[in-house]
Amino acid sequence: MCIRDSIYGGAFNPIHNGHLHLLDTLYRAQTPFGGLDKLLIVPTANPPHKSAGDLIPATHRIAMIRLAVESLPCADKIEISTIELESRGKSYTYTTLVKLKEIYPNGEFVLFIGSDQLFDFQKWYRYQDILKLAQVRAITRQECQRQAVADFLTRNKDLAGISVLVAKPVVVSSTQIRQRVAQGERIADLVPAAVADYIQEKGLYRG
């Protein structure tokens, strides 16, 4: 039996309403393609393209993810994978997919990436092998970006297997949340109440 899993990775530092909207969109987007068995959230440990200086411990990030996804209609489909957190050194998508394939040998993976990541995708470690291990779908948050993405894929024939998903944008970022907390400002409009309470209770992001 083939198991269909969608993979959504990120720092989630912290998880916010934009992430939740996107998770719901990803779940709904897979329904016409036969649905999915699991939606794997993969928190990163030490992403190769970012500084880990302001990354809080994984235990806090995972706890906030669990609190945040409880209210989603697809909550029963969501699974948090610690596979990258358990690896040493930099986290690469290729190695993560190889490990996931070992865990789920019958798995068929759909990897979601941002449109900004797509334009740098050919710089990713073993990107061509990533395309062999998973169906890659690039998320564009604005309809106007779709043509730019389509043109990019047309010019780059080696990325022909990548498809595009348009998702309604929710303007919020983890950086914005961390800055607000550090300045003593409210974040109730950016994250679920349970996450805001957790951040306050644990004294996170206060600088």
Residue ranges of each PLM-predicted region?
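Nucleotidyltransferase catalytic core that binds NTPs
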Residues: 4-207
